[in-house]
Amino acid sequence: MQVLVRDNNVDQAMKALKKKLQREGVFREMKLRNFYEKPSEKRAREKAEAIRRARKLARKRAQREAGIVTAKK
């Protein structure tokens, strides 16, 4: 991963690098790989994440539909 350093502004480059790494999920991956995760624990975690994503999607859909209904009135 590369980040351009402009005008010797290292702080800004570090900020940009951190943002890119965060978006790519590198920090999360490092945290997960820090210790061994049993396959059963991995399945449980992935299932919980899927449920969380589904709830979040349903909540967004409900808000969008409610916004459309109130906008028509």
Swiss-Prot record:
Q: Where are the transmembrane segments?
A: none
MF annotations from Gene Ontology: structural constituent of ribosome
Which controlled-vocabulary keywords does the entry list? Ribonucleoprotein, Ribosomal protein
Q: Which organism is it from?
A: Parvibaculum lavamentivorans (strain DS-1 / DSM 13023 / NCIMB 13966)
The protein's name in its UniProt record: Small ribosomal subunit protein bS21
Q: Name one Pfam family in it.
A: Ribosomal_S21
Q: Name one GO cellular component term.
A: ribonucleoprotein complex
Q: What is the lineage of its organism?
A: Bacteria, Pseudomonadati, Pseudomonadota, Alphaproteobacteria, Hyphomicrobiales
Q: Which Gene3D superfamilies match?
A: Ribosomal protein S8
InterPro entries the UniProt entry points to: Ribosomal_bS21 (IPR001911), Ribosomal_bS21_sf (IPR038380)
Superkingdom, taxonomy of origin: Bacteria
